[in-house]
């Protein structure tokens, strides 16, 4: 037993020890008392008691010490039994302790400077620092925003947080309205603007997934992302075909990455490879041009990654190989469109630099047609992997500029592979993800059992209003019950009239399902991990200090995408240019 525990034990038992010493004087008084019977003995005890107490020191007579020990031990036993059998009362929280949060509850989580916070509601904010003075107040910056159509997900939450301008931003922009309204505000504050537009490829910068392949594992990641987001909405087919496609994609992309010139490392080359892969069911010995290319490569580099993958694919019989090629052709059909081939010919987005300096990347997508949304999902997948690797390999684990992904209409971009693992690990790298949904069930439809893991890694959850039953039921359960006071009255009339009043306590939902369904349009509910929930007003965009730079304030502030892209210098492979040092 260490000294601290010994000291604590002595302090707790000191009162009983003192009572025992005092009781030795009682034993001495009883011993000095005279009497033939018990009545006389008791009467004499009270006469002898003052004599025994005149001596402040305890009596060390064996009989007196025994009485002292019995009294001290008896008192300790009585206290122990009393405490063990004590009734546990929780006044005013008998049926639940739920309540709405107050300004005092959120105060420890707010940074002194307004611009150093994530805006959650009109009155609640969350500091951007991942290392507050008190570690107990540390929360990740992942946010789940749920609100039905017209609840103000963009106006009341996404735009105000974009205007905070404390990080680099990756913004999913349905219809392309956010960049038009906020783009100039970001430019005026020194941001680098990048745009990828799947609605109109003519108004888009170029994105080439092949530009971010640096190793064999990157090839497999790209193939996994491609397959996950081009499988369609129908019933899943035989897993054999998916694995066979994976082998062929890995082989062809591996060849392109390691053997083709840089200007040919893109999806256009991959499509040309597939087009050249003729298969004859009645002639197993037939070799197409791609077979000959891999045969030549095998002679030079027999252990080449692409060769190993291609040899496994070639184990398939002619009819099977033809089916695999048809599946690949159907999956890559969007890349037969010339605009798609052009926009993926080379890369301008430089995804791995978003954590180096303040940058805003707008991913414009259609909210009615999901044909090309798989490209957005591929960007997010590569973005997370690239930034995590750069944080670990270059910056010692933390990016110099925080990167916030504001993913509006999350359900429309397709599945981001391993998102449940990413949201749990990106915090330490100075990356955060904000998922905007119309209903919680959308997330479960895409990520199945992993949806709960994703939600569990969102320290902040905001409900802006909606009527989807599953969302309302789960929020109702999460808010809990409060204890309320009720009273009943009784009034009996007749020959002997009487009146009664009865008070009692009951448990009531802090917000019932029907109350959540009719939530005031100006209100929202915030849940912050470890803190009581808040019923607050939505943030008013017009009150933001940077609102005056947006086109919502003045139409002259509109960001012209076409003009912005036309002013940029476009360099292609093979172009000659002269670099002039301005210094």
Residue map of PLM features:
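A short glycine-/small-residue-rich loop at the edge of a beta-strand within enzyme catalytic domains
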Residues: 109, 114, 374, 410, ...
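Low-complexity, polar-biased intrinsically disordered regions enriched in Pro/Ser/Thr/Gly
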Residues: 126-132, 231-240, 262, 485-505
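Conserved long hydrophobic alpha-helices within structured protein cores
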Residues: 114-116, 120, 374-382, 475
């Amino acid at each position: 037993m260490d000294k601290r525990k010994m000291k604590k034990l002595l302090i707790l038992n000191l009162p009983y020890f003192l009572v025992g010493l005092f009781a030795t004087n009682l034993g001495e008084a009883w011993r000095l008392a005279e009497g033939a019977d018990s009545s006389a003995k008791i009467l004499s005890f009270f006469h002898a008691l003052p004599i025994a107490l005149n001596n402040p020191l305890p009596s060390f007579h064996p009989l007196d010490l025994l009485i002292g020990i019995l009294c001290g031990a008896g008192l300790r036993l009585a206290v122990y039994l009393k405490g063990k059998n004590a009734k546990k009362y929780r006044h005013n929280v008998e049926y639940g302790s739920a309540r709405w949060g107050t300004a005092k509850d959120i105060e420890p989580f707010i940074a002194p400077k307004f611009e150093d916070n994530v805006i959650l509601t009109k009155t609640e904010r969350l500091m951007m620092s991942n290392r507050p003075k008190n570690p107990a107040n540390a929360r990740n910056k992942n946010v789940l925003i749920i609100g039905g159509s017209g609840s103000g997900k963009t106006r009341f939450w996404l735009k105000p947080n974009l205007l905070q301008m404390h990080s680099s931003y990756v913004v999913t922009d349905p219809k392309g309205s956010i960049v038009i309204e906020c783009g100039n505000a970001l430019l005026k504050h020194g941001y680098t603007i990048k745009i990828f537009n799947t609605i109109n490829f003519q108004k888009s910068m170029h994105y080439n997934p092949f530009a971010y392949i640096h190793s064999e594992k990157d090839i497999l990641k790209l193939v996994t992302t491609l397959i996950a987001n081009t499988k369609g909405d129908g019933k899943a087919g035989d897993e054999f075909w998916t694995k066979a496609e994976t082998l062929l994609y890995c082989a062809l992309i591996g060849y392109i990455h390691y053997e083709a010139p840089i200007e040919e490392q893109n999806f256009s080359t991959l499509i040309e490879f597939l087009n050249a892969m003729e298969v004859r069911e009645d002639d197993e010995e037939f070799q197409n041009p791609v077979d000959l290319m891999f045969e030549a490569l095998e002679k030079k580099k027999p252990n080449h990654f692409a060769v190993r993958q291609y040899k496994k694919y070639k184990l398939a019989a002619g009819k099977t190989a033809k089916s695999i090629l048809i599946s690949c052709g159907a999956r890559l059909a969007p890349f037969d469109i010339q605009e798609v081939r052009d926009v993926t010919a080379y890369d301008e987005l430089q995804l791995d630099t978003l954590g180096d300096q303040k940058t805003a990347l707008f991913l414009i997508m259609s909210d009615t047609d999901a044909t090309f949304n798989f490209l957005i999902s591929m960007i997010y997948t590569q973005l997370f992997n690239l930034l995590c690797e750069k944080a670990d390999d270059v910056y010692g684990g933390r990016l110099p500029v925080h990167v916030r992904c504001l993913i509006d209409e999350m359900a429309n971009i397709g599945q981001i592979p391993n998102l449940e693992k990413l949201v749990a690990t990106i915090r330490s790298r100075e990356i955060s993800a904000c998922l905007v949904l119309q209903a919680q069930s959308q997330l479960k439809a895409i990520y199945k059992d992993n949806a709960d893991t994703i939600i569990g890694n969102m320290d902040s959850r905001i409900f802006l209003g909606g009527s989807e039953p599953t969302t309302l039921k789960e929020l109702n359960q999460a808010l809990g019950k409060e204890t309320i006071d009720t009273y009943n009255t009784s009034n009996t009339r007749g020959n002997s009239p009487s009146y009664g009043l009865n008070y009692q306590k009951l448990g009531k939902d802090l917000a019932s399902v029907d109350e959540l369904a009719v939530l005031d349009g100006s209100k929202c509910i915030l849940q912050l991990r470890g803190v009581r929930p808040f019923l607050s007003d939505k943030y008013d965009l017009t009150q933001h200090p940077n609102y005056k730079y947006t086109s919502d304030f003045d139409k002259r502030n509109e960001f012209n995408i076409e003009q912005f892209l036309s002013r940029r210098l476009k360099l292609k492979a093979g172009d000659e240019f002269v670099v002039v040092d301005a210094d």
